[in-house]
Amino acid sequence: MEGIRRAAQRAAEEFLQAFPMAPGSLFVLGGSTSEVLGERVGTRPSLEAAHAVLEGLLPPLLERGVHVAVQACEHLNRALVVERETARAFGLEEVAVFPHPKAGGALATAAFLRFRDPVMVESLKAQAHGGMDIGGVLIGMHLRPVAVPLRLSVRKIGEAVLLAAKTRPKLVGGARAVYTREEMLKKLEEFLPKPP
């Protein structure tokens, strides 16, 4: 389990290095502990593996002031575990259900047991700024547009494939639009007074 914890920690640290999430941002985690242990999703939930993943992933995110949502499995319609303050901050609707390893999954159950004041919410309303998918459980529905894959050097947590994504604001405008501060400043040069 120590290897799982270390891999999760490295993944979180690398994620935050590639995409420095601001305090108050929302991170979504989805995962299958069965896949982490080399089994097919849903066949071998493990609270021990779930705790190892969370022990690695949560500290770097929480130290940065990032809100974390942990997705439950399809038996709970992919509802998520969040802190009550996260639900309030993002206007999320609480639902009346408690996860357990066979309905919700081990990762959501472990998060519910670990969080200070956990609640289940139906959806993130596509407000997550970034996230990780451990084992191909699909988190895209929770991410803001536009999702951008992040390629991390940590490719697996245990035996589960690790996918990560950040998001960026939509690019708007037409032929005259610019998309970086540097481009904007260059365009301004023609409007600045010329020295005599």
Swiss-Prot record:
It comes from the Bacteria. Pfam families: DUF436. Belongs to the UPF0340 family. NCBIfam families: TIGR01440 family protein. This is UPF0340 protein TTHA0583.
